[in-house]
Amino acid sequence: MKCFAQIVVLLLVIAFSHGAVITGACDKDVQCGSGTCCAASAWSRNIRFCIPLGNSGEDCHPASHKVPYDGKRLSSLCPCKSGLTCSKSGEKFKCS
């Protein structure tokens, strides 16, 4: 029941979010299409989705830069798109 509630909350957040694009469930990057990675859910690391790589100005995780990554990602953020780097910007890390 707890998992069901988490999924419902996730779907509601996505429905009202302008930036979230989810392309499918996954376990590893190789299951996702080009330009995406298999990122952990922000609510449960046991749930992963294929999401787009970061564009300029979007949040990123500095230690998450290899695509495809062989293991299971622990971050809910994908690396930046090719040609961009994940750099500290104020209190957060952003693709630039």
Swiss-Prot record:
Its main location: secreted. Residues 1-19 form the signal peptide. InterPro entries: Prokineticin (IPR009523), Prokineticin_domain (IPR023569). Residues 20-24 are annotated as: May be important for binding to prokineticin receptor 2. One of its GO terms (biological process) is endothelial cell proliferation. Keywords: Disulfide bond, G-protein coupled receptor impairing toxin, Secreted, Signal, Toxin. Disulfide bonds join 26-38, 32-50, 37-78, 60-86, 80-95. GO terms for molecular function: toxin activity. GO terms for cellular component: extracellular region. It is found in: Secreted. The keyword Signal applies. Belongs to the AVIT (prokineticin) family. Potent agonist for both PKR1/PROKR1 and PKR2/PROKR2, and inducer of a potent and long-lasting hyperalgesia. Shows an EC(50) of 0.264 nM, when tested on neuroblastoma cells (SH-SY5Y) which endogenously express mainly PKR2/PROKR2. Also potentiates capsaicin-induced TRPV1 current, when tested on DRG neurons. Induces a biphasic hyperalgesia to tactile and thermal stimuli after systemic injection of this protein into rat. This is Prokineticin Bv8. It comes from Bombina variegata (Yellow-bellied toad).
